[in-house]
């Protein structure tokens, strides 16, 4: 337990300081490569399109994808971790710290959304659209300056749970093996969990599992973010964060996505969400938050500060609980 606590804290600090070095291969990209390869193999020889047999086959294949990816991810990460600790406990601790570092994405989220902020600040709307297209799934080519800023803020808010708090909680609970299993589920959902013609049936299992594993972490993330809003000074409104979360946290097709998004909207006093275009089709969405003022590019940095303070609160709470359990 002592080594797990030290590795957990060190991994968090490494993410805060270094983020993701783009020149190095990242295990999450490896999981993405694995998902793509398995999908290609499973889909070969499918029945004719738009037939009941094809729909049933795709659902079976989607379930098999989930099982194979989770088995391989769990076995591979467990082998690395157990092997490192078998060599020498301190080597195991270092390996666990590096694995924890690779699971978390707070710094990466700040850097990528910061690129959007930088281009908007410079008045370069086209470059800002290009930058935000790297971190959102919607069509960005026709977004206004406010639309670009909103898209970046929504990504920061939603990924406070998906990319920071949820993986942190799972890693604290079960070490990097459980952390990477969570990331595998999350990556499958981001790759095949779309409700379009290609993935409606094939990605159903991954999308449903992602909803399940994020249900509690999303709500814990929202509560932690409300706490961060109360502790973050006059730029944030903790009471409004609580009110908007209570009112708007279910205004999303996903049971989890609006949890932290509603808190962020309330804390900043802005309105998020609304209709968006995906693959050329407009998707109707309810608004989240109240339009007390216009969204501006500086709100991207405010959202990032709120995300980072939420991450620190979660890290300190997890470390405290782990230390109490270890006594």
Show where each model-derived region lies.
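Hydrophobic alpha-helical transmembrane segments
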Residues: 1-181, 193-327
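Glycine-rich phosphate/dinucleotide-binding loop and adjoining beta-alpha-beta core of small-molecule
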Residues: 189-190
């Amino acid at each position: 337990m002592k080594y797990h606590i030290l590795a957990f804290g060190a991994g968090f600090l490494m993410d805060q300081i270094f983020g993701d070095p783009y020149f190095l291969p990242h295990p999450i990209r490896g999981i993405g490569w694995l998902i793509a390869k398995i999908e290609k193999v499973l889909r070969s020889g499918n029945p004719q399109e738009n037939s009941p047999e094809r729909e049933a086959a795709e659902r079976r294949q989607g379930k098999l994808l989930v099982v194979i990816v989770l088995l391989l991810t769990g076995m591979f990460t467990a082998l690395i971790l157990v092997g490192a600790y078998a060599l020498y406990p301190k080597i195991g601790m270092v390996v666990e710290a590096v694995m924890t570092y690779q699971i978390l994405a707070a710094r990466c989220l700040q850097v990528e959304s910061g690129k959007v902020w930088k281009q908007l600040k410079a008045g370069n709307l086209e470059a800002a659209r290009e930058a935000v297209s790297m971190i959102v799934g919607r069509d960005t080519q026709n977004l206004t300056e406010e639309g670009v800023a909103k898209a970046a803020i929504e990504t920061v808010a939603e990924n406070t749970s998906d990319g920071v708090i949820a993986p942190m909680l799972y890693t604290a609970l079960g070490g990097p093996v459980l952390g990477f299993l969570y990331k595998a589920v999350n990556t499958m959902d981001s790759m095949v969990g779309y409700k379009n013609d290609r993935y409606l049936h094939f990605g159903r299992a991954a999308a449903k599992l992602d909803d399940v594993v994020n249900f509690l972490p999303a709500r814990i993330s929202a509560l932690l973010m409300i706490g961060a809003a109360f502790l973050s000074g006059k730029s944030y409104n903790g009471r409004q964060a609580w009110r908007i979360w209570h009112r708007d946290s279910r205004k999303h097709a996903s049971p989890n996505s609006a949890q932290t998004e509603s808190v962020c909207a309330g804390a900043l006093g802005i309105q998020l969400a609304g209709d968006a275009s995906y693959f050329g089709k407009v998707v109707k969405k309810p608004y989240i938050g109240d339009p007390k003022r216009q969204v501006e590019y500086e709100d991207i940095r405010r959202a990032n500060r709120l995300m980072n303070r939420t991450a620190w609160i979660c890290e300190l709470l997890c470390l405290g609980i782990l230390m109490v359990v270890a006594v």
